[in-house]
């Protein structure tokens, strides 16, 4: 009996440190009791390393958050431990609760697809209209090289030869066009387009010349002979010299183009 009396009182003495530590308030003891330390060592293999308590942990994490040691499975304790951790640290998101993000390869393909596909074909910056025949559905794939026409810069020697040819032939034939293309280092298309533009310019110049020929100012200009025919003969002091009509006193014999007066005509008749 003495042995039993000595054995049973030792049990509350062993449990007293844990009970004493639990009965205290929110004060933090940097050196936890042995029972908590042993429980922490057993839970270290299953708990998250970010959640494990060590002497350098923040002071707001109290030793009462460590779940008690029991014979139940470890998984419920882990979930309970994570719950307390999220409750005291809301700024640190749990890896399981994070939103899923696409991989780098998937995001790269999406950006590439958005860059190459256009909702409307006229959004393409080009001067040609080749997309009208290529666009069959709602999506249009951009070409690698823009189909832009560049203006051909002709040299002075090329322009001189082309002008000479145009002076003789307004419409160039196919064999002559091939010869000029080889001689001037141009394509047949360049020569054909140049002759088309040159003919349009020549027609405009011809229209301007015809317009000048039918100008009313030029129609009013008549020759001196027409003026002499239309002008009535003046009696007395009128003298006609070319296009100018000059007024003069009585005619004298020194003037070659003398208009005789009425008195002189009567004297001539009497004689």
From Swiss-Prot:
It comes from the Eukaryota. Residues 249-261 have a biased composition (Polar residues). Pfam families: Homeodomain. A motif (Antp-type hexapeptide) lies at residues 119-124. In embryos, expressed in the anteroposterior band of the endoderm, with expression continuing in cells of the pancreatic anlagen and duodenum. Keywords: Developmental protein, DNA-binding, Homeobox, Nucleus. This is Pancreas/duodenum homeobox protein 1.
